[in-house]
Every structure is written in structure tokens, then in C-alpha cells.
Amino acid sequence: MSAMRTGRICTLVVGMVVLGGQMLRAEGQAPTAPQPHQEHAFVTPDGVTWQVGPASLPPGAQFAVLEGDPKHTGLFTMRLRLPATYRIPAHWHPADEHVTVISGTFNMGTGDVLDLAKGKALPTGSFALMPAQMHHFAWTSEETVLQLHGVGPWQINYLNPADDPRMR
């Protein structure tokens, strides 16, 4: 083997060992980002405090923030209680939306207009993920409770400005 080739192989082996060592060392380290929670939290169904709104949804909804603050930067978890025959027109969010159906059936579809023929029924226990900026809509046929988890500040942007209840 030539000296040049032997040198290249040695350099490659040393590089792999150094990289592997860095990866193993990094696995044992604590996260570098500060952890936002200092204490645990338990919320039972009878401990949920419902409020009217939010104003960004059509009238009839109720919400309860379980942790975090959807208006500020960071993780949050909230619940939405929606009445039967509730409609949320086509909209999008600047961050991923994680939805878990706690009770009832939530219907969701993708597209630029609310179309009851193009949705998916999500019964109790279902989970949905809508990626950031995905145009979607939703509706209920019975009272439904959802758990929404995301990263704030949370926003809802209606495709048709006339659908935005904040503009009325």
C-alpha cells in the first residue's frame, strides 16, 4: 500500500473515531434548552375551568387552557368544547396543530372551503395532525371535546376574511 493511501485511511479512521465519540458523549448530556416546567401538573375533568370563546372561533365554542399560554411563545395544551352542528370554516395555522378527540366525533377535512363530503370522521380517542399552513376545516354533529396541543403564539387564519369571527 502506498504511503499516501495509508495516510488517507488513517485520517478516515481517526475522523470516524472522533465523530463516534462526540455522538456517544452527546447522548449522555442533558438537553441544552431550558426546561419550561418546574413542577408537575394534574388536571382532572372536574378541574377544567371552561370559558366562552376563544374569539378566533365561531360563537358557541368553549375553551380551557390546561398548561402554557397559547398567546405566548412555548408549548401549550388546551381543550375545546364544541356544540353539535358546529362549523369551523377553512383556515390554517402557522404551526403544527395536534388534536386529540376526548369525547364525541370531530370531522376534519383539507381544502380551501368547508365541504362536508370531503372530511374524515374522528371518533373519541382519535388523533389528528395538521402541518403548519395546511388549509383545513372542521365540523361536529354532536357535542365534542378536543384537546389541542401546539406551540404558541397560536393563530388561526381564515382563508375567507368574511369567515373570521373577529372581523364581525
Where are these regions (language model features)?
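A short, N-terminal "cap"/entry segment at the start of jelly-roll beta-barrel domains
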Residues: 27-76, 163-168
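Double-stranded beta-helix
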Residues: 39-41, 117-120, 139-168
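Bacterial N-terminal signal peptides
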Residues: 10-21
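Glycine- and acidic-residue-biased ligand/ion/polar-headgroup-sensing regions
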Residues: 83-86, 93-113
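Short acidic-glycine-tyrosine-enriched beta hairpin
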Residues: 112-132
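Short beta-strand His + acidic residue motifs that chelate non-heme Fe in jelly-roll/DSBH
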Residues: 88-90, 108-109, 130, 135-141
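N-terminal secretory signal peptides that target proteins for export/translocation
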Residues: 1-6
